[in-house]
Regions:
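Glycine-rich phosphate-binding loop of ATP-grasp-fold ATP-dependent ligases
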Residues: 1-6
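PLP-dependent aminotransferase class I/II
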Residues: 9-176
Length: 176
């Protein structure tokens, strides 16, 4: 499943996050703000406790995979992710912009047994749940990204050989 954590030195932010995770409660059964039930159960917490011990190592491995993709895909007409100014990307996802050939590339990679994903193909402002609130809104950059992004495999256990296979397949696709 999905999970997450918030780390902060700001006591006010920490308090707000604690409230948001459990119905907006500052005290039991009193919702001071609108919140959700997004607490981890015991099993999820136990798994997270083990996984947190490997977080730095896993992040370093994903960064190494991203650097390998960057080195091997520099000749193809895609936009690859990188570190934000003043920051350090951990590559939870490896999202590249493929332009108008996203769907064709995705099919090609799947034909070569390479898993890909298209995350959030429908922008929030075009979701039925928000139709009334965002009626008539045009967000051309968001809409373009929804049509052009493709996620490549990236997880700590991915071997260098597998990364090379993904990159080779992408290079072959764009060479034809």
């Amino acid at each position: 499943g999905d999970g997450g954590a918030v780390v902060t030195h700001d006591p006010a932010l920490a308090e707000r996050v604690r409230m948001l995770r459990q119905y907006g409660w500052r005290q039991r059964y009193v919702s001071d703000i609108v919140g959700l039930n997004s607490r981890l159960d015991e099993i999820q917490a136990a798994i997270l406790t083990v996984k947190l011990k490997a977080l730095d190592e896993d992040n370093m491995r994903r960064r190494a995979i991203a650097e390998r993709y960057r080195a091997e895909l520099q000749a193809v007409p895609v936009v690859l992710p990188g570190d934000p100014p003043g920051g350090k990307h951990v590559y939870h996802q490896y999202v590249m912009q493929c332009g108008g050939q996203r769907d064709e590339l995705g099919r090609y990679l799947r034909q070569h047994e390479i898993g890909t994903a298209v995350l959030y193909p429908i922008p929030i402002h075009q979701q039925p749940a928000y139709a009334e609130r965002f009626a008539g809104v045009s967000l051309p950059v968001t809409e373009k990204l929804a049509r052009t992004i493709l996620c490549l495999p990236i997880y700590p256990e991915l071997t260098d050989e597998a990364v090379d296979s993904v990159a080779e397949a992408i290079n072959r696709f764009y060479a034809k």
